[in-house]
Regions:
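C-terminal output helix
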Residues: 91, 109-119
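Acidic catalytic/metal-coordinating carboxylates
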Residues: 38-41, 63-67
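Short amphipathic alpha-helix used as the core "switch/output" element in two-component signaling
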Residues: 44, 66-77
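Active-site beta3 strand of CheY-like receiver
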Residues: 49-55
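Receiver (REC) domain active-site loop signature in two-component systems and cognate sites
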Residues: 60
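Short, conserved "switch-loop" micro-motifs in signal-transduction and mechanochemical regulators
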Residues: 87-88
Length: 124
């Protein structure tokens, strides 16, 4: 049996993070490795837990998701960060890519696209 894909959830909205965890729990290939409530905590947990994928909200306190992604990618160049946001403007997509995000899912499409997006960025 292949090893589970370990996912770190980084979102400052606790209820939304719980909803993400519930979506991920529907797929046996995925395992939630941890949760961060701000960008700085996301960096810290990524370095300590070494998840396969980080689901990163863009708008968070302390440090936003773009800054956190840059820091993660600087210290772990192969880290897979999948951006989650309420916006699907081209500017936000470009900013996410420039920060080093491997992919991008808008919050209105999460239920339909999240698991496929995770599998795509880890190459499974």
């Amino acid at each position: 049996m292949p090893q589970k894909i370990r996912v770190l959830i980084a979102d400052d909205h606790r209820l939304f993070a719980q909803a993400l965890e519930a979506i991920l729990a529907t797929d046996d290939r995925l395992l939630v490795a941890g949760q961060a409530s701000d960008g700085a905590e996301a960096v810290q947990l990524t370095l300590s837990l070494d998840p396969d994928v980080v689901l990163m909200d863009i708008a968070m306190p302390v440090m936003d998701g773009l800054q956190a992604t840059r820091q993660i990618r600087k210290q772990r160049p192969k880290a897979c960060v999948l951006m989650l946001t309420g916006s699907n403007s081209k500017t936000d997509v470009d900013r996410a890519r420039e920060a080093g995000a491997a992919g991008y899912v808008t919050k209105d499409r999460i239920a339909a696209e999240l698991i496929d997006a995770i599998l795509e960025v880890v190459g499974r």
